[in-house]
Amino acid sequence: MKILVTGAAGFIGSYVCKRLLSRGDEVVGLDNINSYYDVNLKYGRLGTLGIDKNTVDWYKFVQSNTSEQFRFVRINLEDKQAMRMLFANESFDKVVNLAAQAGVRYSIENPYAYVESNIDGFLNVLEGCRHYKVKHLVYASSSSVYGLNGKVPFSEKDSIAHPVSLYAATKKSNELMAHTYSHLYGIPSTGLRFFTVYGPWGRPDMSPFLFADAMLHGRPIKVFNNGDMLRDFTYIDDIIEGILRVIDHIPTSNQDWSAQNPDPSSSTAPYKIYNIGNSHPCLLYTSP
């Protein structure tokens, strides 16, 4: 099976590539290696996949020196022509879209980057899946879509009508766009809402790294809402196990779906939404 993994230099994407390769799939990894955080970390992850950073260049396919089944190419998702050529030339069986402009607070200062990558870029992925008959699109959503929803633990059946960041709004938009393409063109799609993923090679902007770095350097840990909060932390291996199982489980139409009592996580279209790493929140702090 030939699978495209976008965001292959990212935390989750690099692990997905390794697992797919370990089971014998052919994998094409894509990433733009932007500077949202230290690019050396991204090149380091690619190094674990056999990609020499000195060979990486825009639009150039690089063959892994550790696996004949893995190639990497540097492309921006929002580059419509490059994405069209990629899909046309490679004939992917399945797509795992993990590329996105990440970060909740960063979206406040850099809104256009989120629309370009997370909306325009995702549209290019959907169009590739549509025109080149991809059998299953798996894509990253986010727990951020729950926004002002105060009920915990979150459920896929909960409302996501009130996002509180542009990042969350783009992820909600991805779910709506995917459903539209599943409905109009019959493209099976599965969206995964991740909850604070941590582990080796993790992102330096995420709370586990920030907490540990502050403690190591004797700085106070920044907390919000007076520190009174719940948070789900999910180990990377558990996330990857969930993704791999979903890749092989292609969604079908839910024949029991009712327009009078709609389930937002499924549809009459081949469409599904899952929470990955949710339901056991950790109490971080209780105010006296």
What are these language model-derived features?
Residues N118, Y235-I239, L283:
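An acidic site on a long C-lobe helix of protein kinase domains
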Residues K133-L137, I187-P188, P220, N226, ...:
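Active-site loop of short-chain dehydrogenase/reductase
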Residues A212-I221, F233-I273:
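Alpha-helical substrate-binding/gating segment
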